[in-house]
Amino acid sequence: MAAVSGVRWLTRALVSAGNPGAWRGLSTSAAAHAASRSQAEDVRVEGSFPVTMLPGDGVGPELMHAVKEVFKAAAVPVEFQEHHLSEVQNMASEEKLEQVLSSMKENKVAIIGKIHTPMEYKGELASYDMRLRRKLDLFANVVHVKSLPGYMTRHNNLDLVIIREQTEGECSSLEHESARGVIECLKIVTRAKSQRIAKFAFDYATKKGRSKVIAVHKANIMKLGDGLFLQCCEEVAELYPKIKFETMIIDNCCMQLVQNPYQFDVLVMPNLYGNIIDNLAAGLVGGAGVVPGESYSAEYAVFETGARHPFAQAVGRNIANPTAMLLSASNMLRHLNLEYHSSMIADAVKKVIKVGKVRTRDMGGYSTTTDFIKSVIGHLHPHGS
């Protein structure tokens, strides 16, 4: 795992920085934090972390530019291996897909933009984005929807997590014309994958100190498919007696999120429902530009925006909001045990928003993407100093 190799690198960096005895007696997290401080003083101590970067479509390249500029200013010891894959810019092929997969498998960690999927059917049902996630078995998508201090919305002080299974369900690309004018779309639900995502959700809740998990479903109508998903969640819930478990039908969940989102803590759900709820919940705290996301398999971690939108109409206009991507990049650094740099960047982004002088159009301001990046860089400073 990249995180493990990162800790080893941090150990060597700490010793090289003149603290040969500092590692002894420290926990892994404390040692990583201390080592990360030494990196801030000399990021060239010993190499850097390789990370796959996939800018994607729309404003993706502009958001990745923001990440690279902020990382450079913060002296983050990360080396990006950039690849380009697009179905709308004639940059998609099996060869390019394999190159991206090879890079991700080698590095274990990636940061990606939205790979836009054309509406038109051109002979292949599964998009490159979907194929990428399946081949890496990125079964768990996690979107942390949290209000940003200083930015007022209809609902404030929100803090909820949406976890969805993203390798099966309605988005399985299994469609066919059974008779002329009749299309059948198959929804796949398996016990193994339903149990896996349920366990992931309860493990996440336990690790993060959360108190409640709600399974979102439509088992009243899809009695077998969603019924199996719900049954698996109920079985897994019995193994976690300290975590409160509830269930909620998807249509009621949408209404409750708008009326009283404070009742939610961790939500776990099948693929399509999660895709919809991610976007709805993002709208509660400011929209697609402010919510980070991440996807996990047993081996790989991919960091991205929580609400996946290419925002093609903003390309080249210097108006895209880098907040979500920068916060996602911060989460990536935490995954790599670069706690110092992670906190530095996240704190800088949040300070820019809290001060309120520099805000992009989607947040009611008039600042450009460049203005926002410069302001974030101006707020970088040693965490805790």
From Swiss-Prot:
One of its GO terms (biological process) is tricarboxylic acid cycle. The heterotetramer and the heterodimer composed of IDH3A and IDH3G subunits can be allosterically activated by citrate (CIT) or/and ADP, and the two activators can act independently or synergistically. The heterodimer composed of IDH3A and IDH3B subunits cannot be allosterically regulated and the allosteric regulation of the heterotetramer is through the IDH3G subunit and not the IDH3B subunit. It is found in: Mitochondrion. Pfam families: Iso_dh (PF00180). GO terms for cellular component: mitochondrion. The modification N6-acetyllysine is found at K199. Transmembrane segments: none annotated. Belongs to the isocitrate and isopropylmalate dehydrogenases family. Plays a structural role to facilitate the assembly and ensure the full activity of the enzyme catalyzing the decarboxylation of isocitrate (ICT) into alpha-ketoglutarate. The heterodimer composed of the alpha (IDH3A) and beta (IDH3B) subunits and the heterodimer composed of the alpha (IDH3A) and gamma (IDH3G) subunits, have considerable basal activity but the full activity of the heterotetramer (containing two subunits of IDH3A, one of IDH3B and one of IDH3G) requires the assembly and cooperative function of both heterodimers. This is Isocitrate dehydrogenase [NAD] subunit beta, mitochondrial. The lineage of its organism: Eukaryota, Metazoa, Chordata, Craniata, Vertebrata.
